[in-house]
Amino acid sequence: MIKVAQCWDDGVATDIRLVEILRKYNAKATFNLCPGTLAEETVKPFWTDPVLHTGWSHNGFRGGAVGKKDLKAVYSGFQVASHCWRHETAGMIPDADFLKAALDARNFLEDVFQQECRGFAWPCGKHTPETERLLAEAGFRYGRTTANLADVTANENPLALASSCHFHNWQFWKIFEEAKKTGVFYFWGHSYEMMEYPPLWERFEQKIKALSEDPEVEWVDVIDLPDLLRRNQSAPGTLS
């Protein structure tokens, strides 16, 4: 058996299309949200002129944002995690302000979804020893980075959690096959990276379908990974 986890960042409106695919194949996922960036109403994805537009875009594409009033409808049944209040970056603001941003997002999400929210994804993948310590003391169980690790079970610090790969990695299936040796495969991404390009969405759905139909695959949530890591470290070579 291999345990597979996935997570998606930023709460963009392209997640609406994403969750349809995940629900179709009963795939678990965690969504890392920044409540302070969300309007009350959903903002649809749109294209910009990459030359004239001065704000951020992904090759001229903006993924929009799920509105606060639609959060439960879109993400119900999935795990949600703090991605800070407005995507604040560790090391770029005072540590106390960063901790407040992480907790404000967590408290908001727990209130909306009425479920415990102890997961975290580091905005821009940036983290420091001090912010790791602060989040651990605040009760966060993990902090996902943007680093990759061939053996996810070898993560020594859940507050600096590396994944197997990005979902667009051209060696996705090779990495998955290698991960079978250790029993955990973990990928992440942003749904806006598929833009409105049908081949990318079709390829993604094929991945989810193949994983879900693999009798050796068990979907797990990212919040499950710290326990799996500890269990693996206490009993090398075994994952139940």
Where on the chain are the PLM-derived regions?
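Aromatic/hydrophobic pocket-lining residues that form the small-molecule binding cavity
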Residues: 15, 98, 102, 172, ...
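Hydrophobic "anchor" residues on beta-strands that sit immediately upstream
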Residues: 5-6, 79, 217
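Short beta->alpha connector loops
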Residues: 10-13, 123-127, 165-169
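Metal-dependent polysaccharide deacetylase catalytic core of the NodB/CE4 family, i.e.
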Residues: 25-133, 149, 154-159, 184-194
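Glycan-processing catalytic domains of CAZymes
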Residues: 7, 82, 142-144, 153-173, ...
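C-terminal domain-boundary segment and adjacent tail
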Residues: 24-26, 110, 141-150, 189-240
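Boundary/entry segment of secreted carbohydrate-active catalytic domains
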Residues: 1-14
